[in-house]
Each structure stands twice: as structure tokens, then as C-alpha cells.
Amino acid sequence: MIKSIPIPTAGVSLGLAALGNLLQPYSPLMKYTCGILAAILLAMLLIKILRYPKLVHADMTGNPILGSVAATFFMTTMQLCVYIKDFAPFLCEAIWLAAVAAHAILIIWFSKNFMLNLELKNVFPTFFIAYVGIVVASVTAPAFGYFTLGYYIFWFGF
């Protein structure tokens, strides 16, 4: 089952994490329900990445859509770190910083692999996810006190 989980599952997880944040003022229970579901999906994808790295690498390098959508993994991680930062602040901050750095590395990797020899027929709307998605870091940065970093990331993504 784990082997067949698609990379875009991270996008569903991101949607759930964002929905939970949206519902927080109305129902803390719904916030954490969405967060738990998002974390379960993300954990399943992480297990796939760890158990089948060659398969994931082949998916990402062979398909620019999957390569760009992979950024949602790091975007979700940033959001979920804010969910649980009150329980493990130092760990969450470290994971958040790692997710921001990994997203930046993904931008470089994606640019190198899919943007250097770009042809219009191979351009897809998902390309924006790789570049603009890092703005999630600017939204979540204040939770960890990284206001300046969040400011610059916002303008990069804008």
C-alpha cells in the first residue's frame, strides 16, 4: 500500500492542514482533526520516500508535474510544525527550518532539471507550486520569530 501512495498526496495533506487553520476560530476540535489527518497522510508519504527512494526519485525526475507538486510536502511540513510547536518548540523549529531549506533546495533542483531547457509544450500550471509555495514559510515564520526571513521569502515568492 505504501509503495502506491502518489506524491500529490502531499497536496491533499496541505489542503487539510490549511483547512484546519481556517476552522480554528470555529472549532479547535476540527483544527486538530484536520491536522491529524494531514499528518497521517504526510507520514505515509514520508515512509514511501524512506523505503522506496529510487522509485520516488524516478517519479520526480521523469515527470515535471510530480517534481513541482513535491514542494507541497515541505509546505505541509511547515504548516504542521505550527500546529504542534507548543508541545515541542525546539524540535518544531528545527523541522520548520529544515523544511524551508529543503523547499529552497527543491526550487534549485527543479530549475536545473526542468527549466534550463524549457519548451512551452512542457510547461504546466503546477510549476508555480515549486516557486510560489515557499511563501508558506512567510506565513508560518512569525510563529517561530523569523519575521525578517518571512519578509524576504514573501517577496521572493511574490
What spans do the regions from the language model cover?
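Structural signature of hydrophobic alpha-helical transmembrane segments
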Residues: M30-A43, P89-A104, T148-F158
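Hydrophobic, membrane-facing alpha-helical anchors
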Residues: I40-V56, A99-M115, F158
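Functionally constrained cores in energy, signaling, and assembly domains
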Residues: Y26, R51, Q79, H103, ...
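Helix-coil boundary and interhelical linker segments in multi-pass alpha-helical membrane proteins
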Residues: N21-L29, V82-E93, V139-G150
